[in-house]
């Protein structure tokens, strides 16, 4: 055996080097995939407390690092078109005697949601943390109001049909230059006398590819321009 190894030493040495190279390549791949998994942002959008339209819309950060929630966008797809609203900030309509009730509601929301500050969901979200942005019913009513749709209970009036509600979050992750995002679509189902809401997909869609992040940049610019225009109109009125 030793004579055979001595005679074929060069070939054995080459095979040994190739085997060692393969082991190191596999080891490097494992390290790379482990590093990428730890660095990959992971955000979830789910229903909480209930399973119908009264459920809370919960955003969870399952990433290894904190994320900064910059925008929360909701899109209501209807038979009369799509309504898109930036719901990052809460809006309240005041009537006589509403000040105390809204203050109590604000305090309650602040206790149950870790980010709400001065009526805004914008801010950092720690790893393993979560925040609820509102109930799906409240989001639907807010978008219906902005779209000019009349509501009776959970149902739209005047022949309007609600098809789906999509929630999209735009965040800054760690030291990344471009934003990352996540979105999930929920479909309305007729469940008399109320209204049901079920996820259209089993998981939250991650928006982290290069072209998706560039699209999020353009959306941020559009949202900021819209905010500037609203501020200008308010100051002139």
Predicted regions located by residue number:
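Glycine-rich, aromatic-bearing surface loops/beta-hairpins
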Residues: 147-237
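A structural detector for beta-sheet-dominated domains
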Residues: 46-48, 88, 136, 170, ...
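Asparagine-centered strand-capping/turn motif at beta-strand->loop junctions
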Residues: 58-63
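Membrane-embedded hydrophobic alpha-helical segments
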Residues: 2-34
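Contiguous beta-strand segments within globular domains
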Residues: 49-56, 133
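Residues at beta-strand starts and edge strands
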Residues: 53, 67-70, 129, 161-165
